[in-house]
Amino acid sequence: MATKNSKQNMSVLLTKLGDRDTFTMAARELDLMARQIDPSSSSGNLQSFISVILSVDTGDKPAVRKHCIHLLAVLSVSLPLNSLSPFLSKILTRITRRLRDPDSSIRSTCVAAVSAISSRTTKPPFYSAFMKPLADTLFTEQEVNAQIGAALCLAAAIDSASDPDPVRLGQTLLPRLEKLVKCNAFKAKSAGVVVIGSVIGAGGLSGTSVSSGGLKGLVDCLLSFLVSEDWAARKAAAEALGRLATMERNELGEFKAKCLKIFESRKYDKVKAVREVMNQMMEAWKQVPDLSEEVSPPRSNASSKGDASDGRYPSGSRVGSTPAKSRTHLVNRSTPPGSSLATTARKQANRKSIDQKKTSLTASLTKPNVRRRLEWKAGGASIPTGVSLEDEQHCDHDENAKETSHSSHNTVQKLGGVSSSLNGNIPPSGATMVTGHHVLSENPNSNNCKGLEDISLIRNQLVQIEQQQANLMDLLQRFVGSSQHGMRGLETRVHGLELALDEISYDLAVSNGRMSNGSSRNNCCLLPSGSFIKSKFWKKHDSKYSASRMSTYRNRNAETTEIQNSRHRFNGSPGFIVNPLAEIRPDNDLQVCLTIEGRRETKPSKASETLKTTV
């Protein structure tokens, strides 16, 4: 009876969820009911509650469907561990059906519910409880919303599970995921990359023996998504690469240089969220040890005595190196005692045997010294010997006391190899060379060389920025020049219109007899050229005076015309332009009559007839 009443109450509350006015009240009551369920009671309240929740179908309103899935998360959090294990298969089946819902908020609620249930479920095992049903949905669904939802649910379940079975994740799921995200038929690539990141974060690579080729394929797969047009795929790939650098940092030395170059070219993403993840991922990859850092600790001084059997090298001044790991390949060269650099170093070692123990390896070689040696290398000349090397080292000690000993080792050994090659056909022997009073090992991955490469890259970027600024300045100058040209053209046209109006005023005044031919040249501006006036301004082309004046001014330049116009307008003195038509003569009996549709035209005077003839 109690169970029946409980189902009725829940049905009423679910109905109220569909109404916007009663949604808040019904949601609060359902959450309270879910928290008060006792799973140990024999009344079956938990089973009836879950059955009512799962009975909601697509015919209900989206708010009802969404809150019913939310109630599953509330149940998993409020109930003891493994309380929902008997209903887990039914719950996941219903959730996978909800993943096809076009409403993205419902899919997000499904992901949150799966995460909550996974965190509170330890039995049955993760593989059979979550990974198998969700992975089957991910690999078999053809609808994009279902693919996205299944991938995100699987990733949330892996992240939240207390024991996600990382060995099986790496052996079974990860290879299939790599093939899936590379398939063109799979639309939810960003969600698939999220699952790969979750598998890496759960220890899927460390829990099984992954070959170098398999790791390289995974890194290449993730790098390919950094150039994707989908910003979500770029963000997911950056997160996965960051987790990979955190979990498998000791196995990524051979990929570090290549990956960091790609990261540098992609870190300025246009999406802020992607930029933030990129920066975090780059910091994680910078912590990955280089190939040179995988070398074991140096040998003792006693073990290196055999390398100096001739007695010319002081004891305690040699830094040897043991063989590297299988992935590290170091080529060591030494400078024979006959070379100029070795002779200078031997003399300095004999002179400064006391200071030898106090001076650190950092002071022996610094960035200016490396720069000078690189210049000698580029010039094709051998490295100078004698006292200048000692002065260089002393100056470098004062300026750069913070240079690391590892970078000094690498740079000196590399430059020693160059010097030995320049001094003749000297065969490489052993594993050391002498510079100053230190015997150093060669390291091809020199930090100083990397610094020089970074400086060269920065210089190239600055040159590109300078070129872009120069192009912008050229564009601005062209724009300003075209604007000035347009203003000059407009000014010329306006000036031509003014001249045309003055010419018309002059013709009307002459035709009306208000000015004589002699005085008109002092009161009106003359037209410099016929190109300023369209043909519609000329009513008669047989005017002798106009034709003669047009031919007179056609060959004059603009400057002469402006001087002449200003002289005619102002009569040689400051004042306004006088329009002859504006003068009113009281003795003039000119009558101009307008004829409009049937009105009789008055008899014009002699002056009006002359005006009509002119127009």
UniProtKB/Swiss-Prot annotation:
InterPro entries from the UniProt entry: ARM-like (IPR011989), ARM-type_fold (IPR016024), TORTIFOLIA1/SINE1-2 (IPR033337)
Compositionally skewed regions (Polar residues) per UniProt: 318-347, 407-426
First and last residue of the signal peptide: none
Positions of the UniProt region annotated as Disordered: 288-446
GO CC entries: microtubule
Keywords: Phosphoprotein, Repeat
Name of the featured protein: TORTIFOLIA1-like protein 3
Taxonomic source organism: Arabidopsis thaliana
Gene name, Swiss-Prot/TrEMBL: TOR1L3
